[in-house]
C-alpha cells in the first residue's frame, strides 16, 4: 500500500512537470507569434512612411466656340387644321427672320409638332373633375440653332421681341455655350496637373532629406467646368457649366511616389 502511495505521488509530480512544460511551450509560442505580428506591423508602418501622396492641379481659362440656342412657338385653335396652318405660317416667318440675320439654313433645326387637347374643367371641393368641355388644340414646335458664330447668335437671341411684335408667339431660352476642343484641353490639363503634383512631391522629399523614387500610383480626379470669376460651387461628381461663354476648367491628379 505504501508503495502504491509513493507511485501516485511520483505520477502527480510527473504530471505537474508536464503541465509546466506545456504551459511554457504555449507561452513561448504566443511570444513568438506576437513578436512576428509586431515585426510585421513595424515593417508595414515603415513601408507606408516610404510613400509620398500628393495632389496636383491643372487649371485653364477658355472661351466657348459653339453656341446652342433653343426656342419654341405655339398656336391655339378650336380646329386642328387651322392650328396647323397658323403654326406653319409662324415657322416660315421665324425661318425667314433667322436667314435674314445671317444664320445658315443648315444651322436651323425644327422639331416635330407636339399636339395637346385643351379642356375647360370644373372641380368639386375635393379637387375632383366635375365636368370638362373641349375647347380646342394647342400646337407647339421647337427650333434649335447651333452655330460657331457665337456673338451673332447671342445678339439674335436678344432681339426676339421683333418676332413677338410681328405676331409670332416665340418663347426664347437662354443660349448654351460649349467648347469643341474640350478633349485636347483636358489632355493638356492632365499633363499640367501631373507636373504640378510631381513638383510638390519633389519639394516634400527634399524637405525630408530624401529623394523621390518611382511612381507607384496615379489617379485622375474630378473634371470641373465653371464660369470664370464666379462663386459657382464645385461638385463631387463634376460640374459642366453651359450658361457662361467664358469658362474655367479644373482637374486634379493624385500621385503616389516611393521615396529613398
Task: For each feature predicted by the language model, list its residue ranges.
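Short, charge-dense linear interaction motifs
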Residues: 12-260
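Short, Lys/Arg-enriched N-terminal segments with co-localized hydrophobic residues
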Residues: 1-14
Amino acid at each position: 500500500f505504501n508503495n502504491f502511495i509513493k507511485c501516485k505521488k511520483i505520477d502527480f509530480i510527473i504530471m505537474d512537470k508536464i503541465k509546466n512544460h506545456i504551459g511554457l511551450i504555449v507561452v513561448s509560442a504566443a511570444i513568438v507569434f506576437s513578436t512576428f505580428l509586431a515585426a510585421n506591423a513595424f515593417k508595414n508602418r515603415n513601408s507606408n512612411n516610404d510613400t509620398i501622396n500628393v495632389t496636383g492641379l491643372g487649371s485653364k481659362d477658355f472661351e466657348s466656340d459653339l453656341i446652342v440656342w433653343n426656342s419654341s412657338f405655339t398656336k391655339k385653335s378650336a380646329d386642328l387644321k387651322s392650328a396647323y396652318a397658323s403654326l406653319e405660317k409662324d415657322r416660315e416667318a421665324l425661318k425667314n427672320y433667322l436667314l435674314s440675320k445671317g444664320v445658315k439654313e443648315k444651322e436651323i433645326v425644327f422639331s416635330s409638332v407636339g399636339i395637346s387637347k385643351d379642356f375647360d374643367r370644373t372641380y368639386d371641393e375635393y379637387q375632383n373633375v366635375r365636368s370638362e368641355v373641349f375647347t380646342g388644340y394647342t400646337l407647339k414646335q421647337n427650333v434649335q440653332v447651333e452655330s460657331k458664330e457665337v456673338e451673332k447668335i447671342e445678339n439674335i437671341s436678344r432681339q426676339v421681341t421683333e418676332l413677338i411684335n410681328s405676331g409670332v408667339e416665340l418663347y426664347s431660352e437662354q443660349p448654351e455655350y460649349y467648347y469643341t476642343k474640350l478633349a485636347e484641353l483636358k489632355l493638356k490639363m492632365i499633363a499640367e496637373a501631373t507636373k504640378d503634383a510631381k513638383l510638390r512631391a519633389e519639394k516634400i522629399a527634399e524637405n525630408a532629406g530624401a529623394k523621390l523614387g518611382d511612381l507607384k500610383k496615379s489617379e485622375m480626379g474630378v473634371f470641373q467646368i465653371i464660369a470664370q470669376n464666379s462663386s459657382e460651387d464645385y461638385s463631387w461628381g463634376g460640374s459642366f457649366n453651359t450658361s457662361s461663354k467664358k469658362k474655367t476648367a479644373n482637374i486634379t491628379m493624385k500621385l503616389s511616389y516611393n521615396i529613398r
